[in-house]
Amino acid sequence: MVKTALTAPEGPPSDVEEIKEKSDYLRGTLKEVMLDPISAGIPDDDNRLMKHHGSYLQDDRDLRNERQKQKLEPAYQFMLRVRLPGGIATSKQWLVMDELAHKYGNGTLKLTTRETFQLHGILKWNMKKTIQDIHSTMLDTIAACGDVNRNVMCTSNPYQSEVHHDVYELAKKLSDDLLPQTRAYHEIWLDEEKVAATPDTEVEPMYGPLYLPRKFKIGVAVPPANDIDVFSQDLGFIAIIENEQLIGFNVAIGGGMGMTHGDTATYPQLAKVIGFCTPEQVVEIAKQVITIQRDYGNRSVRKNARFKYTVDRLGLENVKEELEGRLGFALLEARDYHFDHNGDRYGWVKGINGRWHYTMFVEGGRIIDYDDYPLMTGIREIAKIHSGDFRLTANQNLIIGNVTSHKKKQIEQLIQEFGLSDGQQHSALRRSSMACVALPTCGLAMAEAERYLPRLIDKIEEIVEENGLSDKEITIRMTGCPNGCARHALGEIGFIGKSPGKYNMYLGAAFDGSRLSKLYRENVGEEEILNELGSLLPRYAKEREEKEHFGDFVVRAGIVKETTDGTNFHVQ
């Protein structure tokens, strides 16, 4: 059998590729422009490089028009994202992040859909000190954004403590071993002296001088929980457990959520399982998958540059064959597994190690003190006495983890004192909601998401309650643009911002994260959304089969067609 020759797409390099090529391994002129007192912003070329250091330049879009009228530059600020593999932070790290949010940020913390922290509202003059303070807690922001491997996720699963520990250690190893090797970050932010490279020095043996064509995301799931949406990842590992022992992983490749409105050549896609590997093989598999994307990904058209398009263009079997050739061994046959949900399980759970875990509901992932709900203060007080850890979940919630029996009562008292919610007073719909930041800080947002979804759910809850569905979990997700940070295409009800107050509405994703949704209504506002759900939810309440989820119902009832693959996502 003749091996298929793989090729990269032809075409001139994109502007970002040219910026990376000239950047001296992600240095650019960042060191100089961050010292420039004239503007609170930085040039676009340096902002493209800044992503690889874990940050984006943004501006407060609520103030944009007024500042234009006053002939002022935009209200520039930076978002800073922490690298936190597996989403686990110590109490000390939590307290430092809380302090930095108040000292340099906007007084809030954002828990992201990739299990890490974001600080918003940091001014240019405070960036270096903020990064140094983060570094002092043994954390960093390296490769939290950019054309590299991003934050590695793993299931926040307190039910299987031993397996979770093994998977978490693997997530950390993946994150560390796949880091860029350039010292640019350390020189710019931590004042490390630059060492001149010798001619035979290979600065980036894995990534190369151009890094990857686009971002790359890895996640590790522990069935039956698919809380990390493993099929949304460029590279996913599904833990296989036998006799309560981790024996290996199924390997899935080629997932991703982003697309571009109006361009059917872009689409969300689910990763496909290609085989099984042992725990010892995971890191090498990840490295070789990354090099395949490095060599064959699209460096000409960025909207088609994600690994999912590389896999679909080259063919799944051809990519698998190339991977096995680079590895020098064949993947074994995939093992059986079962997912039953992609949400979180709330409240207290006792792990098999005798430690306790309390999962809190954090709406929109925003840690803030509300007028009637001192959420941020309450968690801060717990962090002061907590000897365990904090686990940031992929659904933007928070687990107070590894609580000892003698500390549990003390923490329970603080939970009660500050009213820290496990979400049981809310509908299951609200507990199953997720939204990206969107306005006012995200430059890509076309509509609201985090600030609006809770208000929309207020009104949907009336329909839910009228139809006896308050305790029925229905995943609902909203993003301000089609990039998919809140994994909208895996929501049983999904909204993608189209313009202020207008959204594309999607239905029919699987409750366990194994099927994409389908476009149901285009460019609808709140009134149309409520009218549609006012018709659909009563039908679901009356016509559903036993234990049938909403996403399955709308497909079975013919309300939307089933999306069998990302390549037919746009087919109506």
From Swiss-Prot:
Residues where siroheme binds: 485
Any Gene Ontology biological process: hydrogen sulfide biosynthetic process
Keyword Amino-acid biosynthesis: yes
Annotated InterPro entries: CysI, NiRdtase/SiRdtase_haem-b_fer, Nit/Sulf_reduc_fer-like_dom_sf, NO2/SO3_Rdtase_4Fe4S_dom, NO2/SO3_Rdtase_4Fe4S_prot, NO2/SO3_Rdtase_4Fe4S_sf, NO2/SO3_Rdtase_FeS/sirohaem_BS
Protein origin, superkingdom: Bacteria
The protein's Enzyme Commission number: 1.8.1.2
Gene3D superfamilies: Sulfite Reductase Hemoprotein, domain 1 (3.30.413.10)
Cofactor names: siroheme; [4Fe-4S] cluster
Catalytic activity: hydrogen sulfide + 3 NADP(+) + 3 H2O = sulfite + 3 NADPH + 4 H(+)
Cofactor binding remark: Binds 1 siroheme per subunit.
Family, per entry: Belongs to the nitrite and sulfite reductase 4Fe-4S domain family.
Annotated PANTHER family: SULFITE REDUCTASE [NADPH] SUBUNIT BETA, SULFITE REDUCTASE [NADPH] SUBUNIT BETA-RELATED
Protein name: Sulfite reductase [NADPH] hemoprotein beta-component
Name of the encoding gene: cysI
